[in-house]
Amino acid sequence: MSQKRIILKRRIQGQRRGLELELAIHPLSNGVIVVNYPGITGDIDGYNNKYGQQADFIQEKEIGTVVRMGNPVYDELPYPRVMIDNFRYVIDHCLSHGKELSGKAKPTLYLMGFSAGASTIAAVAGDYSEVEKILLMAPSGDAGQDAVEKGLDKFKGEVYITVGDRDEIVGPGAGQTFYDLANSAKIRKLVIVPNCDHQFRGERNGKIMSKAPLWAFAGDNSFPSPDGGKKLYD
């Protein structure tokens, strides 16, 4: 499937040099933009290009344009503020370039994230009326408890959460925590994936991970079955 790469330059107050944010764009002209945010230090493509493959899968299913980004750590900048601000910057870019990215000047946004990326989404989604659905995979508390609680309390769209029952980083209980906090959501769903760790390792769990956005954004109720999923890795 087609994709293009661009670099956004974000100015940082008090810093001589700004940040360069690489975006990978998988285009579709249906008025929907799906923004993907990986975990902390997560590469834009992920292990074995799993995020690129997942984006292609979303594009193939005609869910929307996919915009991918990395989640680097900067020693000279405060964490988690820079992680949150980078994501906001990319969302703002998507909204201001909606026609170019999605074929619609005022696009609908779906947000999906993993671990710290999911935490960031939980914190900021409620600030954007254009965001209709969010997918939180193995969500962590990296964005800060207060930010997550306030963010989810404000969000009135659809919330989809999935985590492995053997998650050794955030624990399967994180899914229930985020579910309980999303008490303003129009729809909220939680799926605990059996025999699955934090990274969704293994061919079966990779296929399940590939189907998570189909469940959240396209109503695929076969999730978390791996059947029909895309092989992301062995």
Annotate each PLM feature.
Residues 16-18, 24-70:
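Short, surface-exposed "cap/lid" segments of acyl-processing enzymes
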Residues 36-37, 137, 193:
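Alpha/beta-hydrolase
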Residues 49, 148, 157, 171-181, ...:
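Short alpha-helix in the alpha/beta-hydrolase fold that links the catalytic acid
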Residues 77-81, 176-179, 184-234:
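C-terminal catalytic histidine-bearing segment of alpha/beta-hydrolase fold enzymes
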Residues 77-102:
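Alpha/beta-hydrolase active-site loop
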Residues 93-154:
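Primarily recognizes the serine-hydrolase "nucleophile elbow" in alpha/beta-hydrolase
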Residues 142-143, 166-170, 198-199:
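Acidic catalytic loop of the alpha/beta-hydrolase fold
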Residues 155-156, 161-163, 167:
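Short beta-strand/loop motif that positions the catalytic acidic residue
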